[in-house]
Every structure is written in structure tokens, then in C-alpha cells.
Swiss-Prot record:
It is an enzyme of class 2 (transferase). The gene is trpD. The keyword Metal-binding applies. Anthranilate 1 binds at G88, N119. Catalyzes the transfer of the phosphoribosyl group of 5-phosphorylribose-1-pyrophosphate (PRPP) to anthranilate to yield N-(5'-phosphoribosyl)-anthranilate (PRA). Its cofactor is Mg(2+). Pathway: Amino-acid biosynthesis; L-tryptophan biosynthesis; L-tryptophan from chorismate: step 2/5. Pfam families: Glycos_trans_3N, Glycos_transf_3. Gene3D superfamilies: Nucleoside phosphorylase/phosphoribosyltransferase catalytic domain, Transferase, Pyrimidine Nucleoside Phosphorylase, Chain C. Its EC number is 2.4.2.18. This is Anthranilate phosphoribosyltransferase. InterPro entries: Anthranilate_Pribosyl_Tfrase, Glycosyl_Trfase_fam3, Glycosyl_Trfase_fam3_N_dom, Glycosyl_Trfase_fam3_N_dom_sf, Nuc_phospho_transferase. It comes from Shewanella sp. (strain MR-4). Mg(2+) 2 binds at D232, E233.
């Protein structure tokens, strides 16, 4: 769309009114194609933020970004079990160990098909991609190789900038604004593998139910959207607020560590460090040599993923399966296999 054709949509926004899903998709398509002036983009993002983005607007922005993404070749014939993503928005302000990335290895080793969509760090010192780079896992692995890893190893990591080139047009504006915008919630919603199942952590309790409604609008089959006492994942240090999408309905409830069959820990026990230090922690956990707090934090998140995939009938049973998988050494073996495939592809 040209600058003149998006003007009526911007006028609606600047009057404090909401856009439809289709109208928002049109605006974001223009942005992704690099056809939106930066001043206009800043105005659009701030108008959305100040009024508060609606379910339809977040869904429309996600539609545009999904449509423009580099395709992920995973035919429906290979989707019999369904794919899950274990992902957080980031930006919760805490520097924890890489819980969701480590949980992805555990869930995959326990039988889930995990396509984890990730990026470099938002709030911690070490994001999902920073950690994987430490293990020699190539972030720019071709979509074809990533698809083969998902098929043969149950796990692949999809580096967001590799699939969503158009987002680069928003980077200078986002950096200049220095405040959260709709982009902070879009990352987890635009996985190019289009997972049927999602364990999605959000940085604010106010986002839990709205983001579950967005997943419902986007056609996700089953999901848990969680906020864990300040963290964008299931909490070991307190209660977790959950909106679960199942059979087209959303139910809201709270979980505590006792619901998973593990003891509560202190937040300080989950603090992470630089990527090299976090890589050491992840390796220890996957080898069955992590601290109780680290191991349990990973297991309760992997346990929710296993529950969502239908591999366990409760989050408690899922956590037990995750803990047994860690003890078996299968998750550590998977880390080594993925690193090996990645390094061979780079030779």
C-alpha cells in the first residue's frame, strides 16, 4: 500500500479508535515491505500502545508477519503428532537461566516435536539464540535442514531474523522509542512452523488472557499462556497465572510448584549470567547434574509442554516425565546431536 492509501487507516488510529484485523494487517504489510516512513511508524506504534492494542489488532499484525515470513518446509503429512513452541516474550526484567530453551531439549527428548522460535536477548544477558551459539548450533541453519532436524531429532530452532527479514525496518524506530510496543508480543505469535500447540510466557499478568485470545483467533489448537510471579514462564518461586486454550475454550487458573509435585525455590536461585555461564548451567541440567532449583524450573516448563502435546495427562505427570528424561541423559544426548548436525552442515 502507498503512503496515501494507508492514511485513512492512520487517521482512524490517531482518533483513538480501533482498527479491524484486516486494516491492521494492511498497515503492518506496508511496514514489513519497507514502505512506511519512520516518523509515521513511530506514530502508529505509539497510537496503538497508548490506547492499548486490541485482540483484532494483534492478530492482524501477526497475520501480516506470518504471511511475509520465509516459508518453513514441513508438510502436513509429517504433522501427525503436532508441533509445539515453548517461548516467552522476554522483557520481564529478570536475568534468569535459559529455562524455556533448556526445557525445549527436555520436551523433545521426551517425545514432543519442538520448533522453538527465538531471538537474541530482550531482558536477560543471554537469550535463546545467545545460548545456542555457545553450543555451536548455527542460528542461520537453512529451513530445509531445520525441518530435517525436527523430523529426525524432534527439535529445531528457528532464528526470528532469518525468517522475518521485514522486521528490520522497525529496528531503528523501536530503539529510538525505548519503550515496549506491539512488537514485544508479536515474536512468539509468528513462528514460521505454525505450531499447533504453544506454551507462551508473557512479561505482564495483564497480557495472559488477551494473548490466549489472540492464539485462539490465529487458530492455535492448544495453548497455555503463562505469567509466573514476574517471569515470562512457569514459576518455581511463586504462583503462575494461566490461560489455557483447549477445545476452543479458554479457562483461567493458577498453578503453584506443589501442583507440579516439586518444592518452591527462591528467585535468587534461578539467576543466570553471561551466555558462557548459562551454557554451562544448561549443560549441567541436561546431564542430570544441575541444582534442584534449576532442574525443577526446567522440568515444570517442559512438563506443561508435554501436557499440551498430549504426552501426559496432567502437568504433574508431565513434570515427572521431564525429570525422568533428564535423569536418562536423553536430553543431553539430543543437545550433542543437534550441535553435530549443525557443525557438519557448516563444513
Amino acid at each position: 500500500m502507498s503512503a496515501t492509501s494507508i492514511q485513512p487507516l492512520l487517521d482512524i488510529l490517531f482518533q483513538g479508535k480501533a482498527l479491524t484485523r484486516e486494516q491492521t494487517a494492511s498497515l503492518f504489510s506496508t511496514l514489513i515491505q519497507g514502505e512506511m516512513n519512520e516518523a509515521v511508524m513511530a506514530g502508529m506504534l505509539m497510537a496503538l500502545k497508548i490506547r492499548g492494542e486490541t485482540i483484532a489488532e494483534i492478530s492482524g499484525a501477526a497475520d501480516a508477519m506470518r504471511a511475509a515470513a520465509k516459508p518453513f518446509p514441513y508438510p502436513s503429512s509429517m504433522r501427525t503428532e503436532g508441533i509445539i513452541d515453548i517461548v516467552g516474550t522476554g522483557g520481564d526484567g529478570f536475568n534468569t537461566i535459559n529455562i524455556s530453551t533448556t526445557a525445549a531439549f527436555v520436551a523433545a527428548a521426551a517425545g514432543a516435536k519442538v520448533a522453538k522460535h527465538g531471538n537474541r536477548s530482550v531482558s536477560s544477558k543471554s537469550g535463546s539464540s545467545d545460548l545456542l551459539a555457545q553450543f555451536g548450533i548455527d542460528l542461520t541453519m537453512s529451513p530445509e535442514l531445520a525441518s530435517r532436524c525436527l523430523e529426525s531429532l524432534n527439535l529445531c530452532f528457528l532464528f526470528a531474523p532469518h525468517y522475518h527479514g521485514g522486521v528490520k525496518h522497525a529496528v531503528p524506530v523501536r530503539q529510538a522509542l525505548k519503550t515496549r510496543t506491539i512488537f514485544n508480543v508479536l515474536g512468539p505469535l509468528i513462528n514460521p512452523a505454525r505450531p499447533e500447540f504453544m506454551l507462551l510466557g508473557v512479561y505482564s499478568p495483564e497480557l495472559v488472557t488477551p494473548i490466549a485470545r489472540v492464539l485462539q483467533a490465529l487458530g492455535t489448537q492448544r495453548a497455555m499462556v503463562v505469567h509466573g510471579s514476574g517471569l515470562d514462564e512457569v514459576a518455581l518461586h511463586g504462583s503462575t497465572q494461566v490461560a489455557e486454550l483447549k477445545d476452543g475454550e479458554i479457562i483461567e487458573y493458577q498453578l503453584t510448584p506443589a501442583d507440579f509435585g516439586v518444592p518452591q525455590a527462591q528467585m535468587s536461585e534461578l539467576e543466570g549470567g553471561e551466555p558462557a555461564q548459562n551454557a554451562q548451567i544448561t549443560q549441567s541440567i541436561l546431564q542430570g547434574q544441575g541444582s534442584d532449583a534449576h532442574t525443577h524450573a526446567v522440568a515444570i516448563n517442559a512438563g506443561c509442554a508435554l501436557y499440551l502435546c498430549g504426552l501426559s495427562d496432567s502437568v504433574k505427570a508431565g513434570t515427572a516425565l521431564a525429570l525422568n528424561t533428564i535423569k536418562s541423559g536423553k536430553a543431553f544426548e539430543l543437545l550433542n546431536q543437534l550441535a553435530k548436525v549443525s557443525s557438519e552442515a557448516q563444513e
